[in-house]
Amino acid sequence: MAEVAGLVPGDVVLKRGEPIPAEPATGPIYVSTRNDDLQAIIDGCPPDRREDLVFMQNGMLGAFLEKNNLADATQVLLYLAVAKFGEKPTDGITELNPDGLTAATGKWASTFATRLRNGGLKCRDLAGDAYTEAMLEKHVWICAFMLVGALNGGITVGEVEKEHSEQLRAVVTELCAAGEAALGVKLAPGAFERLAAYGRVVAHFPTAVKEFEWRNGWFYAITEAAVKDGKADPCPLHTAGLKELGVVKEAVAA
C-alpha cells in the first residue's frame, strides 16, 4: 500500500506475522499480502475490526470472503504497476479508459479512492453489478494473459498482446462468456479491446500461471461443474492450455 499511494500521518505498517494493534481503533486495514496468507490475517484480526479489512488481491475472493462472513468486505481491483520498490506506480490509464481502471467497493471504497486521488492516481468507487463486471474483466485479464504467455514460453504481457493477439482474443472471449454465465452479469462490448489496451500499459510484466486456486482455478471449477452435469466444457481452450502446461494432470471428462 505504501508503494501505491505513500504513507500519511497515522499510518501503521505491519509486516507478515505482526499482530494488528489496538490503535488506531478505527479506519481501514489494507491487506496487501499473498492470497494464501489471507486466512491467517483474518484469523488474527480482532473480530470487531474484521469489517475494516480491505482486500487488494488478484483473483476471485467471493466464496472465500463469504466463508469468513465477510461477503460485504471492501475489495479493490488494482490496475497499477510498480517496477521496483520506491518508484512511482504506473496508473492503469489507457486510451480506452482515460479515467483509469482501478476500482473499489464496500465500506472503505470512497476512502481508498480519495487516498489514491490524493496521490495522483485514479480510482472508481463501484457497487453491485458494476463492481462484479469490473472484477470479472480484471480476472479474465490476468488469467488469459498469464495462460497465453506461459503457453508461448513465458513471454511478456506486451509480447502476448502484440504477437499472439488472436490466441489471446479466443481465450478472453470464452472466459468472458463463462464468467458472465457464472456471475449473472453482462460485460459491456469491447472487453477484449479494453484488456488489450491495459496489456500495452504494463507490457514489461512477465507471464506465468500462478496462485491457481485463486485465479485460473476459478474458471477450471466452472469447467468441472459443467462436465459433471454432462454439458460441454465452456472453456475448452483454457482447459487445454492448463493441461499442456501441466497445471492440471488431465482434461476433465464426463
Write out the residue ranges for each language-model feature.
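Rossmann-like NAD(P)(H) cofactor-binding subdomain of soluble oxidoreductases
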Residues: 1-94
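Hydrophobic, Leu/Ile/Phe/Ala-enriched alpha-helical segments that form helix-helix packing faces
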Residues: 4-8, 33, 41-45, 112-120, ...
